Regions:
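Beta-strand/loop substructures that line and gate deep hydrophobic ligand-binding cavities in soluble
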Residues: 75-127, 135
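Hydrophobic ligand-binding cavity/cleft-lining segments
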Residues: 1-40
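Short, intrinsically disordered, mixed-charge
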Residues: 19-26, 66, 118, 122, ...
């Protein structure tokens, strides 16, 4: 199993970043616009996200912990035999850290997922640091 991780330092408050992350149906508007171009909610905990390259993924929310500011989700179906992810927002001096981890099988998907994570991380940084309200 390939384990991928991104840690992004953001000049934005942990509260504001957590608010955007936990808004499961608005990832295309609040978290990573441009990278995610659309989100369709199938139920309270299942969404279909469409990405800039036309690919899509059906994701289920596994858990959402407000105290830890941690969201866990998994992809249902698709090319991955296993896809589990989590994102956590931590306080940091002058802003926060966004820690994103994905475990995926088969390992052959890792280069594609790694590239998508890099693009997603860049979109999140741009969006969250530009959001009104300051750090």
């Amino acid at each position: 199993m390939a384990s991928l991780r991104r840690e992004i330092v953001l000049a934005a408050s942990a509260e504001r970043v957590w608010s955007a992350l936990r808004d499961f149906g608005a990832v295309h508007e609040r978290l990573a616009p441009g990278f995610v171009t659309g989100t369709t909610m199938e139920s309270e905990d299942v969404r279909v996200v469409t990405f800039f390259n036309g690919s899509s993924a059906r994701e289920t929310r596994v858990g959402c912990d407000d105290k830890m500011r941690r969201l866990a989700y998994a992809i249902l179906g698709g090319r991955a035999a296993h896809y589990a992810a989590s994102a956590e927002v931590r306080d940091d001096e002058g802003g926060c850290r966004f820690v994103w981890t994905i475990d995926v099988l088969p390992d052959a998907l890792a280069p594609y997922i790694d590239d998508m994570m890099s693009r997603g991380a860049a979109a999140m940084k741009k969006t969250l640091e530009a959001a009104p309200g300051g750090p």
